[in-house]
Amino acid sequence: MAQKDNFAGGFLLGTVIGGVVGGILGSVLANRAATQSPDREKLDTEGVGNLDSEENIELARRRLEDKIAQLNLVIDDVRDQLGHVNELNNIKEVQEEHR
């Protein structure tokens, strides 16, 4: 019975802490994204009538290129992190085989 109480308490504590951390992280990332794209204000102020202009198409293309570059960096970072985990697992397996 005590384990169920500990689980429920831990679950609720994890939910609260996760919500706080997620909220803070979300606001920081949203603020950073807003400061990195000053061209967004320009697009918003031009109105709907000029959405097909060459300048707006070029602006959208640059934004997409930037986002793709950011995604590639994140993918490379995760690949590196997972590579280190795989290396550690392989070392542990080899050590266990030699025992």
From Swiss-Prot:
The chain crosses the membrane at residues 10-30. Residues 50-84 form a coiled coil. It is found in: Cellular thylakoid membrane. The keyword Acyltransferase does not apply. The keyword Coiled coil applies. It is a single-pass membrane protein. GO terms for cellular component: plasma membrane-derived thylakoid membrane. InterPro entries: Ssl2009-like. Keywords: Coiled coil, Membrane, Thylakoid, Transmembrane, Transmembrane helix. PANTHER family: LOW-DENSITY RECEPTOR-LIKE PROTEIN (PTHR34048:SF3). This is Thylakoid membrane protein ssl2009. It comes from Synechocystis sp. (strain ATCC 27184 / PCC 6803 / Kazusa).
